């Protein structure tokens, strides 16, 4: 959702991908969260999960069984949002010809844009579509849900300290909902990037997606699921971005090269851009904003893409040591670079030129993200601005390292982070850019 902006260690499996950085910042690559057990009445045990990922503590994270089974009631879910639009995944390497043909027909950016339009329309129509709040039901299960949300907050505080701090400005309901989404994203990420990633299979991800369906249907399995189930029953959050994130996990099991930026764009949407679409309905749009809903959602998507592209550029050497290249292969070829140049870590003039182009692209997405960030509810802006400013500085550090991202890890020094956080807070207090733009037009 941030001492480096993130810390990283090698994954324990060749199928592991890098830790995906999304709108959440300060997410160290520690292996798993030790989740405290909370005593609830026992229920019949469910079918065994497809894997068991355990941390140094007594409880696993990142797999289907995490805490005690949830026996409390959950608020009835919202009616299904109409018109779900699925974004088809790129094919594995052996289907590259089919992938190229499909990409030529409908570019990934257009497919993702269609999803953004759908999400924006659903959010705009949400007040008319939502079921009346079940206040009595919420009060009846408040005790158990409070414990669930508190645990989500503990996980967020431990693994995303700066992001957690920034959420303190949000209203309690929004803050807790963001924590619940963060925890689900982290658990999903651990499926293919955790200590048991070598045992992960497509079937396990299918079961995780089935469990997601249960969450949205108001049938949570454990306390962390219950927190998310309550969140999606309270806010107009659509299931499709969650499904698409799982699709990104599937991609990491089968694909280690990306032929073009079109392919890479879709991957970045899956593992990072989706988070923006998940969280905007919770963060809300400022009542003063004069921007259309689509602009805000496109900005949230752009921040996820920018963060992920930055993450990719920072971790080129680390990924190469795992046999992975998350760079557009056609652009590498046009720059006169080969896979051997990547695996050998050659910092040449050609590499510097190539990296300058990649950094320029990432910065363009950051600029687009600024447009959406300023339109959010004021109390929700600080964590978004913190993510944007801190991650953008990683690009500066790559340049400062003379584009050596093979053996040098770019990170934001603590002093710069300290300066960036109040700057992010100041930006969060400014009027939406759409209001400032209109004011400048009327005064001129």
Swiss-Prot record:
Signal peptide per UniProt: none
Transit peptide boundaries: 1-54
Database matches in PROSITE patterns: SQUALEN_PHYTOEN_SYN_2 (PS01045)
EC number(s) given by UniProt: 2.5.1.32
Reactions this protein catalyses: 2 (2E,6E,10E)-geranylgeranyl diphosphate = 15-cis-phytoene + 2 diphosphate
Coiled coil location: none
MF-aspect GO terms: 15-cis-phytoene synthase activity; geranylgeranyl diphosphate synthase activity; squalene synthase [NAD(P)H] activity
Listed InterPro entries: Isoprenoid_synthase_dom_sf (IPR008949), Squ/phyt_synthse (IPR002060), Squalene/phytoene_synthase_CS (IPR019845), Trans_IPPS_bact-type (IPR044843), Trans_IPPS_HH (IPR033904)
Tissue specificity: Expressed at low levels in roots and leaves.
Keyword Cell membrane: no
Induction: Induced by drought stress, salt stress and abscisic acid (ABA) in roots.
Gene Ontology terms describing biological process: carotenoid biosynthetic process
One cellular component (GO) term of this entry: chloroplast membrane
Membrane-protein topology: Peripheral membrane protein
A Pfam family reported for this protein in Swiss-Prot or TrEMBL: SQS_PSY
Compartments reported by the entry: Plastid, Chloroplast membrane; Plastid, Chloroplast, Plastoglobule
Main localization of the protein described in the UniProt heading: plastid
Family according to the record: Belongs to the phytoene/squalene synthase family.
Name of this protein: Phytoene synthase 3, chloroplastic
Phylogenetic classification of the source organism: Eukaryota, Viridiplantae, Streptophyta, Embryophyta, Tracheophyta
């Amino acid at each position: 959702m941030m001492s480096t902006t993130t810390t990283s260690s090698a994954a324990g499996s060749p199928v592991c991908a890098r830790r995906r950085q999304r709108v959440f910042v300060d997410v160290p690559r520690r292996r798993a969260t030790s989740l405290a057990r909370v005593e609830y009445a026992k229920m019949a045990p469910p079918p065994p999960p497809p894997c068991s990922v355990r941390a140094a503590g007594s409880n696993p994270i990142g797999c289907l069984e995490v805490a005690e089974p949830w026996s409390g009631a959950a608020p009835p879910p919202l009616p299904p949002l109409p018109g779900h639009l699925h974004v088809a995944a790129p094919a594995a390497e052996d289907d590259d010809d089919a992938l190229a043909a499909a990409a030529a027909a409908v570019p990934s950016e257009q497919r993702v844009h269609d999803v953004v339009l759908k999400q924006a329309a659903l959010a705009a129509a949400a007040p008319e579509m939502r079921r009346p709040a079940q206040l009595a039901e919420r009060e009846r299960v408040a005790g158990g849900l409070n414990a669930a949300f508190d645990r989500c907050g503990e996980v967020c505080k431990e693994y995303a300290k700066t992001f957690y701090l920034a959420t303190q400005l949000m209203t309690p309901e929004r803050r807790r909902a963001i924590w619940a989404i963060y925890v689900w994203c982290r658990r999903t990420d651990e499926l293919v990037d955790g200590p048991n990633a070598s045992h992960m299979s497509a079937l396990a991800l299918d079961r995780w997606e089935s469990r997601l369906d249960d969450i949205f249907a108001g049938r949570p399995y454990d306390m962390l699921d219950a927190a998310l189930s309550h969140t999606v029953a309270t806010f107009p959050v659509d299931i499709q971005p969650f499904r698409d994130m799982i699709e990104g996990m599937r991609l990491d099991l089968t694909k280690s090269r990306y032929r073009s930026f079109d392919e890479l764009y879709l991957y970045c949407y899956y593992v990072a851009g989706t988070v923006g679409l998940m969280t905007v309905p919770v963060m809300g749009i400022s009542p003063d904003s004069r921007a259309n809903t689509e602009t805000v959602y496109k900005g949230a998507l752009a921040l996820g893409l920018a963060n992920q592209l930055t993450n990719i550029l920072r971790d080129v050497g680390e990924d190469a040591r795992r046999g992975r290249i998350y760079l557009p292969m056609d652009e590498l070829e046009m720059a006169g670079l080969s896979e051997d140049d990547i695996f050998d870590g050659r910092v040449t003039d050609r590499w510097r030129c190539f990296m300058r182009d990649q950094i320029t692209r990432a910065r363009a997405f950051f600029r687009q993200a600024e447009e959406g960030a300023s339109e959010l509810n004021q109390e929700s802006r600080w964590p978004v601005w913190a993510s944007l400013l801190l991650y953008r500085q990683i690009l500066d550090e790559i340049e400062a390292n003379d584009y050596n991202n093979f053996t040098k890890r770019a990170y934001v020094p603590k002093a710069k982070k300290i300066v960036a956080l109040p700057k992010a807070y100041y930006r969060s207090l400014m009027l939406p850019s759409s209001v400032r733009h209109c004011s400048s037009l009327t005064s001129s």
